[in-house]
Each structure stands twice: as C-alpha cells, then as structure tokens.
C-alpha cells in the first residue's frame, strides 16, 4: 500500500488482458506501445474541473487538478504527481534524445515524459498524453477496474481532488 492508501500490486495476466481489451486503438498505442498522441488534440488538455487524473488502464490516481498547469506544449502538464510512488521514471533514449519517461507504477503503462522546466514549487513538468488518463470529478468515486477496493483510499478523494 502507498502512503495514500493504494495497492500497487501489478495486475495479473488475466486482469491485464481484460483491461487491455477495453482500450481504443489510440489508447493501446500510447499506453502499451509507448506512442504519443498528436499535440493540442487530447480531450483532457482544456479540462479545468476539480478532480483526479488516473491511469486509463488500471485506474491508479496519477495527478490532481490543482497541480495541472498550462505549459503551451499541447499536452496536459502537471508539476507533481498524486503520490510520488504512483509514477515511475524510466530513462528513455528513443529518437536520439535522452528523456525521462513516466509510467504508471502499478500497471507499467506509458503516460508521457517529465522535464525539469516546470513551475515552482517542483520545477518539474509532467507532460502526459490525454489518452493515458481518465478524469474523475471531485465527489465521484475513483475508478476501480481491478476491484481492489482502494478507489476511496483513506476516504479523502473529495479533499485530495
């Protein structure tokens, strides 16, 4: 369990197959094959409501609305994760660049990249694909596609959102 009350145990093979079967082709390309959606096209880019952004594949909360900011890059950007342990950093040397890829710590799905050019207080910019995320408005139970019972972890979704 994380400090915020979520189980990071990876999905079983059967659970993973079930979750992957529910993805659109674009979601599968980004989440499973490390693709990138076109800039300025993502459905969550202009989302300004209070709530939580969770992993589209497994439902783990990854970012809060209050850490989202307008970066001008064309992808939703956040200056901090929901819980540091929910987002995993992996060195990415694809396309002749050295970057830090961000993945969901529970299901290992690709989310985007993190760069050291964000606003205070962290100085980080988590640049995330909209199709990698699922938005849950404050006051609505978080998704629990794995049936772990942690979708109301600590019962603080309204306060944490």
Locate predicted features.
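A short Gly-Trp-Pro
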Residues: 7-161
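Accessory (non-J-domain) regions of J-domain/Hsp40 co-chaperones
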Residues: 1-6
């Amino acid at each position: 369990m994380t400090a915020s009350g979520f189980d990071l145990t990876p999905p079983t093979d059967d659970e993973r197959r079930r979750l992957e079967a529910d993805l659109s082709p674009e979601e599968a390309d980004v989440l499973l094959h490390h693709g990138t959606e076109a800039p300025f096209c993502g459905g969550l880019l202009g989302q300004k409501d209070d709530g939580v952004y969770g992993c589209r594949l497994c439902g783990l909360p990854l970012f809060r609305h209050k850490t989202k900011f307008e970066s001008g890059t064309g992808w939703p950007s956040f200056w901090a994760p929901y819980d540091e342990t929910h987002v995993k950093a992996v060195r990415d040397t694809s396309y002749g660049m050295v970057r830090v890829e961000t993945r969901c710590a529970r299901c290992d799905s690709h989310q985007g990249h993190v760069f050291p050019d964000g606003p205070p207080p962290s100085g980080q910019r988590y640049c995330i694909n909209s199709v990698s995320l699922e938005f849950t408005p404050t006051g609505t139970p978080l998704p629990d596609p794995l049936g772990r019972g942690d979708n109301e972890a600590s019962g603080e979704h309204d306060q944490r959102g």
